[in-house]
Amino acid sequence: MLENLSTEHRNEKTMNLDEMNIKEVLQSMNEEDRTVALAVEKEIEHIEKVVRVVIQSFEEEGRLIYIGAGTSGRLGILDAVECPPTFGTDDKMVQGFIAGGLKAFTKAVEGAEDREELAEEDLKSIGLNEKDTVIGIAASGRTPYVIGGLKYANSVGASTASISCNKNAEISKYAKLNVEVETGAEILTGSTRLKAGTAQKLVLNMISTASMIGVGKVYKNLMVDVQSTNEKLVERSKRIIVEATGVSYEVAAEHYEKAERNVKAAIVMVLLQCEYGEALEKLKVAKGFVKKAL
């Protein structure tokens, strides 16, 4: 029942929300938002377990699949689409599904979140298998679309995890690993796009970033698998080579082009004073980890 969910309770601090001036509303929101990171902190051990499972999937050439409805689904897609430019992944490695399909990203599709079978259809469409990890996201922790997806994922032997913003969430029963970030009542009653959505975004940031570090997509604190898809990222790539090696911008740019715009290879070429082919071979042996290649 909705009334039993803490995310649906009325916030005692904002009973007069409609009487506040603009600054008071903003201060109230900011005050509530400060509690979110602390709520996430309490779940770090559970998030760590999820990351380990995702890394294992990646090492076995499996995928990370997010499923959710409404804001939760949009946040999963947002995290997924940022992985290729940030970490050089292909667009299949991390994917997001939203109840009602991609059109639901910009406009609500009535009733889609209430149909368990839609998630099964979505996961079947990508050939979900036992190497993959499916993470179901639902602020309420009770969305049928997410439950249906987790049920199907379990049936094919995939790893499963859930992210919710209520304790003892319904979706936790259907996932092998659970993250329950208790964000409590929103300033606007039931509007879980606020604190709950912020918490979900923080957790997704943690999962994708830590997992990519775990498979060699980062050297020191540099995103060395960045894809140079625009001028800003081309410049960032050259700056990463400068930061990683200490050479001048000009030398970094030269090696960047010699390495066919492969930042990792350029770094190895500079630091080991080797040719492009040798750098690639060292990275292959090191399974993509720059530090190991060096």
UniProtKB/Swiss-Prot annotation:
Its EC number is 4.2.1.126. Gene3D superfamilies: 1.10.8.1080, Glucose-6-phosphate isomerase like protein, domain 1. Residues 54-217 form the SIS domain. Pfam families: GKRP_SIS_N. SUPFAM superfamilies: SIS domain. The keyword Lyase applies. The active site is at 82 (proton donor), 113. Pathway: Amino-sugar metabolism; N-acetylmuramate degradation. One of its GO terms (molecular function) is carbon-oxygen lyase activity. It catalyses: N-acetyl-D-muramate 6-phosphate + H2O = N-acetyl-D-glucosamine 6-phosphate + (R)-lactate. GO terms for biological process: amino sugar catabolic process; N-acetylmuramic acid catabolic process; peptidoglycan turnover. Keywords: Carbohydrate metabolism, Lyase. Belongs to the GCKR-like family. MurNAc-6-P etherase subfamily. Specifically catalyzes the cleavage of the D-lactyl ether substituent of MurNAc 6-phosphate, producing GlcNAc 6-phosphate and D-lactate. Homodimer. NCBIfam families: N-acetylmuramic acid 6-phosphate etherase, PRK05441.1, PRK12570.1. A lyase-type mechanism (elimination/hydration) is suggested for the cleavage of the lactyl ether bond of MurNAc 6-phosphate, with the formation of an alpha,beta-unsaturated aldehyde intermediate with (E)-stereochemistry, followed by the syn addition of water to give product. This is N-acetylmuramic acid 6-phosphate etherase. The lineage of its organism: Bacteria, Bacillati, Bacillota, Bacilli, Bacillales.
